[in-house]
C-alpha cells in the first residue's frame, strides 16, 4: 500500500496528510506519478482517497511510479500473486520477510510477547539466532551470548524478555494460529477455526472441505490453511514448537444463546480513550458475559 505525504486542511477543519493508492492497478488507472498534483476527497466523509490527477500541472522530469520487479532487500524476483493485487518477494529465505513474520508473530494480535521490539528482531535475524518462529523459544539457550553481545540489553532486560517468551508458551492456541501469518487468517478467523478444531494438530489432518465448514472460511482461506499445514517445513516447525512446550490446545468455552447471538457489531468513527482494536476487544469481552 503506497502513501504520499501531503499537507491539506479541508473544509471540515481536519488535516489530511496521507491518502492511500492501494496497489499498482490503482496507480496505473489514475496514471499518477512522482511529483503529480492530485485531487483528494473524503469517502463517506471519513477516508481520504485520491480522485484524479491534474495532469496540466505535471512537472518537468515527471516519472511514473512502478513497484520494483526485484526485492530491494535480497534481490530476488518479485511476482504478483494470482487473483490478487499483492506483489511479493519470491525468495523463501528473504530476511525482510522473516523479520515481518516474526514481528507479526510476537505482536499484540498474535502471541502478544511484550517488549520484543523490532530492533531486537532485526538484530536476532541478522545474527542468525532466529531462522523461524520456533527459534524464538530457544533463545533462552543463548542467554549468556545475548547478554554478552547486548542484543536485548543488559542482564535484567534480557531475562525479562526471556521470561515473557517462556510465559507465552501457555497462550491459547488461537494466538499461535494467528501468529503463523496464514493469508486470510487473522485473529477473529483463528478464534472461529479453533472452536471447530480444538487443537493445532487437528488442522494437520483437516481437508479443505472440513475447513470450509467453519463459519467465514471460504475456498481461498481453506486452501491457504490446507497448504500451510501440509508444507513439510511448517510441519517440522510445528513439531518443534510442540517439543518446546508451546501450547497447541484451545481453551474450552461454553456457547450460550443470548439476545446478541448471531449479531454483528460494527465499530466506526473515533473514541476519545480507545483505539479501534481496544474497543473491539472490550466489546468482545463484554459479549462473553452477555
Predicted regions and their residues:
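Short, surface-exposed secondary-structure edge patches
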Residues: 24-31, 256-257, 274
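DNA strand-break repair and replication-stress modules
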Residues: 98, 105, 149-288
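Conserved small/polar residues in nucleotide/adenosyl-binding loops
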Residues: 3-10, 289-290
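Short, structured beta-strand/loop micro-motifs enriched in basic residues and often containing a Trp
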Residues: 13-25
Amino acid at each position: 500500500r503506497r502513501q504520499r505525504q501531503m499537507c491539506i486542511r479541508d473544509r471540515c477543519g481536519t488535516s489530511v496528510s496521507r491518502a492511500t493508492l492501494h496497489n499498482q492497478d490503482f496507480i496505473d488507472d489514475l496514471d499518477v506519478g512522482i511529483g503529480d498534483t492530485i485531487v483528494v476527497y473524503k469517502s463517506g466523509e471519513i477516508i481520504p482517497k485520491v480522485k484524479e490527477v491534474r495532469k496540466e500541472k505535471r512537472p518537468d522530469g515527471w516519472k511514473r511510479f512502478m513497484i520494483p520487479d526485484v526485492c530491494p532487500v535480497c534481490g530476488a524476483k518479485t511476482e504478483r500473486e494470482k487473483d490478487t493485487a499483492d506483489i511479493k518477494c519470491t525468495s523463501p529465505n528473504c530476511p525482510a520477510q522473516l523479520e515481518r513474520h516474526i514481528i507479526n508473530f510476537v505482536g499484540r494480535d498474535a502471541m502478544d510477547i511484550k517488549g520484543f521490539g523490532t530492533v531486537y528482531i532485526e538484530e536476532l535475524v541478522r545474527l542468525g539466532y532466529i531462522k523461524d518462529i520456533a527459534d524464538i523459544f530457544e533463545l533462552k539457550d543463548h542467554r549468556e551470548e545475548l547478554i554478552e553481545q547486548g542484543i536485548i540489553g543488559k542482564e535484567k532486560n534480557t531475562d525479562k524478555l526471556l521470561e515473557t517468551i517462556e510465559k507465552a508458551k501457555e497462550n491459547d492456541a488461537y494466538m499461535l494460529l494467528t501468529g503463523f501469518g496464514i493469508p486470510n487468517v487473522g485473529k477473529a478467523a483463528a478464534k472461529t477455526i479453533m472452536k471447530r478444531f480444538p487443537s493445532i494438530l487437528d488442522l494437520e489432518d483437516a481437508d479443505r472441505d472440513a475447513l470450509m465448514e467453519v463459519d467465514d472460511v471460504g475456498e481461498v482461506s481453506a486452501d491457504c490453511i490446507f497448504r500451510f499445514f501440509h508444507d513439510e517445513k511448517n510441519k517440522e516447525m510445528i513439531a518443534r514448537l510442540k517439543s518446546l512446550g508451546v501450547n497447541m490446545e484451545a481453551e474450552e468455552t461454553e456457547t450460550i444463546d443470548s439476545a446478541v447471538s448471531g449479531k454483528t457489531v460494527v465499530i466506526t468513527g473515533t473514541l476519545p480513550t480507545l483505539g479501534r482494536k481496544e474497543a473491539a476487544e472490550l466489546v468482545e469481552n463484554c459479549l462473553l458475559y452477555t
